[in-house]
């Protein structure tokens, strides 16, 4: 069975949900921006965690373009939208930078800008 040309990605924030189509070679943040959805981001390199989201399903995201992404991040369902490429249909809770920074601190992993994590 061949891979689909695009994946459905549902972006969740509060009580709002927006669905976009994202090709496997496109970063999720870029596809959202093209669709008129402005998500948090700063470095666009997968380092600062500003773009962090969290999977709300068992989807798969390729984070090979990320400067810092750890197995613990994947296990906890965190994704970096600015460098993540979909490998399946996804449901992602956006605006998760604070939660990801707190998680990283709890695992003694680098958490840039973690003074904002509480």
Residue map of PLM features:
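N-terminal start-of-chain detector that recognizes signal peptides
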Residues: 12, 21-27, 51-56, 62-67, ...
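Cysteine-centered iron-sulfur cluster-binding motifs in ferredoxin-type domains/subunits
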Residues: 42-49
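Short, flexible, mixed-charge glycine/proline-rich loop motifs
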Residues: 40-42, 73
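Iron-sulfur (Fe-S) cluster-binding modules
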Residues: 1-4, 87, 93-118
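Functionally engaged cysteine thiol sites
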Residues: 12, 43, 82
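N-terminal pre-ligand scaffold of iron-sulfur
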Residues: 1-39
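Iron-sulfur (Fe-S) cluster-binding segments and ferredoxin-like electron-carrier domains
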Residues: 34-35, 50-100
């Amino acid at each position: 069975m061949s891979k689909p040309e695009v994946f459905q990605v549902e972006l969740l924030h509060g009580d709002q949900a927006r669905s976009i189509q994202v090709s496997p070679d496109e970063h999720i943040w870029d596809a959202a921006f093209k669709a008129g959805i402005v998500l948090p981001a700063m470095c666009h390199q997968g380092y600062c965690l500003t773009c962090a989201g969290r999977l709300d399903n068992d989807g798969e995201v390729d984070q090979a373009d990320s400067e810092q992404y750890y197995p613990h991040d994947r296990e906890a369902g965190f994704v970096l939208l600015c460098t993540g490429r979909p490998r399946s249909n996804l449901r992602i809770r956006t605006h998760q930078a604070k939660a990801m920074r707190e998680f990283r601190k709890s695992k003694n992993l680098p958490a840039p800008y973690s003074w904002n994590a509480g």
